[in-house]
Swiss-Prot record:
Annotated protein name in UniProt: Cytochrome c oxidase subunit 5A, mitochondrial
Job description of the protein: Component of the cytochrome c oxidase, the last enzyme in the mitochondrial electron transport chain which drives oxidative phosphorylation. The respiratory chain contains 3 multisubunit complexes succinate dehydrogenase (complex II, CII), ubiquinol-cytochrome c oxidoreductase (cytochrome b-c1 complex, complex III, CIII) and cytochrome c oxidase (complex IV, CIV), that cooperate to transfer electrons derived from NADH and succinate to molecular oxygen, creating an electrochemical gradient over the inner membrane that drives transmembrane transport and the ATP synthase.
The keyword Metal-binding appears for this protein: yes
Disulfide bonds: none
Species whose genome carries this gene: Scyliorhinus canicula (Small-spotted catshark)
């Protein structure tokens, strides 16, 4: 996961 605002526990929506 490349969390920008979210953490790495989030999904890869912030690619």
């Amino acid at each position: 996961s490349h969390g920008k605002q979210e953490t790495d526990e989030e999904f890869d929506a912030n690619l």
